[in-house]
Amino acid sequence: MSLIATRLQNWRVENPELDRNMTRPCEYGALDFFIEQTNAGNSILSPKLRERAFASIGNTVQVPVINYDGDVTVSNVRTCVIPDDENTSALYTVVWATYSVGFTMVPTLYMNNEISYDHDFNRKMEKVCRAFANSLDQAAVAALEAGKTKVLKDKLNYKFAANVIEVPTQMATEIMGDINPIMRANCYPGLVHVVGNAGIDSLIKKLAQHGIYNDVNKRMEYENKVFHYTNNVVNEASKNGTFFAVEDGNVGVLTRVDREALNRTRANFHEWDVVRLPYIDLPVGSHYYTAVGDQSQTAGAASADMTCNVKEYFGFSADVAFVIAYNGNPITVANPIIKAQIAARAENVPLGMPVYVTNAGEFPAGGASA
């Protein structure tokens, strides 16, 4: 005789917070930077352009611009006849890329499942939003990469190769302070934003250890900048940190949605709208509809009986364009973006602050320890 047949089974207690890290977002610093600059008072994208571009699906968006003129003549004599000095115009074409994500839900699937509808919906929404944001962040980094300056009026004592400042390990603690003079020499003296990765975050924290009351005050290296961090700025081999320095007010992002979303159409059980998704502070198009069909293969034995059931469809999409301030002659005219990368030091070797001996002549050969 035994009670084994009626022994309590495993206790299952729904607790959605336990798996929260399975859809955790990263930091999308490049995307956040473009969005912030779009909404700034000195944005390169006017409200009119944003509004017209948002409704431009099916059309090409072009912006009239005037090219740089480096041939202005300054005379040393007065004349009764003032010469012409005409500008040259061009059309800047906005380049769009389409992004689309979606998922489905079968409402009655949860009648015999420990996972609730809300738990499953929330995790699906979180993971598609995370993927959407990550793709946009990667595109923002690619835009910075493509827009980095080819011209440095004064590179100070850094090596400038392949349009990148190569920072030796010994100068890692100096580059943040030197970026401002380099930008100023390129005629960009404004506030600098830094879009960097974990290596740059580490560097800033090390500089912060040497503050106003420490041996050397390194606050001026970084305190006049705005930092944005993302894992999508990737180090090349033998590099320990990579960043883009960008003058304030020189980038932005445009979006547009499909025609039905723009019109908020409702037809044949389909619904379109314009929404803002978590992690992405941009307007995107949404599409929702339901259908009836065989759902028996959705969850194996748990859905084997579901041969005619309702299924919900959730879709989100947008065309996105990352915009850099126009430059019709990037070979001659500097762009407001500088890329720099810091050489890696050996593993388990700390980053040391340089020590300069100004009275070396007072010590005998062999140095101060002799």
Question: What is the predicted function of each stretch?
Answer:
Residues 29-101:
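Assembly/oligomerization interface modules of large self-assembling protein complexes
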Residues 149-226:
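Extended, solvent-exposed, turn-rich assembly/linker loops in the middle of proteins
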Residues 14, 37-41, 51, 182-185, ...:
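Surface-exposed polar/charged interaction patches
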